[in-house]
């Protein structure tokens, strides 16, 4: 027998559906993702820490869960919302169902609700806080709990997902016949500052020839002074970039000493370090089909995105240029310093899930690191 679950929002509305994954209660900021596939990568993306993800595609879970398509060591989302959850799956790599995977990771999910109506609400009103519960049956109480949740901008989420110790990474891209390809690269040495880095970012750097060392953001300066990398990479991560003071200070310390590249949160940190400002988007960019224009070449890239904040182009100093624009809302998707070896993109060129249009950025960065 299916167990009832309720999703209640801070605006007073609620949706009644069915439970899948773990039972219990969870809360967070609701965002929607437009990807048709890649739910396992989405679930394990540290940038989703503190959020409940709503999938716009209707059928989720039909290819199960495998051991390879993970972007961190555990599921990161606070909750999961889908229209139709598949409890039976079919894929040659699958090891378990999505339902089993969520249970193992203690993630509360809800299915069987009108996700189209929910997404329209988020799109029109903006991201809002919500609570999923299988234990509390009074929607009014759940609405009140949603309203009492802390704002995502008030939380230090990077601290929850970043590495605690330095470690080296040599796992490259995945080959369906041979598995992950490992490489013992020697040069250039790239220090990845881990604000919640996705595994596929590390794999892409290794596959392009870099030797990768992952460094926690706290005390990163001491680590960099010790290992003396050829370049610095600022990773993706959750939350408000203005709260990542350590990353902003680190970028300012080394922006005239080392080549630096940033992705997602790393892009915003670079923007702040260079003198710009950031702001929160109404409902963020989350999905694998966002068109971005490279203003230098005129080419259009289809990109994977997952961010809630953006750089204000009017705030950037004259020596920083905007290199990429989102064609859906004209927000900044890439910046570059005119004189220093620093560039960053707001989207995810490593895909996972998503297209491969922007792989060239890793090649450019590794070449820059080689001097």
UniProtKB/Swiss-Prot annotation:
A Gene Ontology cellular-component term: carbamoyl-phosphate synthase complex
Pathway: Amino-acid biosynthesis; L-arginine biosynthesis; carbamoyl phosphate from bicarbonate: step 1/1; Pyrimidine metabolism; UMP biosynthesis via de novo pathway; (S)-dihydroorotate from bicarbonate: step 1/3
Active site: 264, 348, 350
Lineage, top ranks: Bacteria, Pseudomonadati, Aquificota, Aquificia, Aquificales
Listed HAMAP family: CPSase_S_chain
Keyword Signal: no
EC number of the protein: 6.3.5.5
Database matches in Pfam families: CPSase_sm_chain, GATase
Name of the gene: carA
Family that this chain belongs to: Belongs to the CarA family.
CPSase: annotated span: 1-190
Protein name: Carbamoyl phosphate synthase small chain
Reactions that this protein is recorded to catalyse: hydrogencarbonate + L-glutamine + 2 ATP + H2O = carbamoyl phosphate + L-glutamate + 2 ADP + phosphate + 2 H(+)
Function (record text): Small subunit of the glutamine-dependent carbamoyl phosphate synthetase (CPSase). CPSase catalyzes the formation of carbamoyl phosphate from the ammonia moiety of glutamine, carbonate, and phosphate donated by ATP, constituting the first step of 2 biosynthetic pathways, one leading to arginine and/or urea and the other to pyrimidine nucleotides. The small subunit (glutamine amidotransferase) binds and cleaves glutamine to supply the large subunit with the substrate ammonia.
Top EC class for this record: ligase
GO biological process: 'de novo' pyrimidine nucleobase biosynthetic process; 'de novo' UMP biosynthetic process; glutamine metabolic process; L-arginine biosynthetic process
SMART domains: CPSase_sm_chain
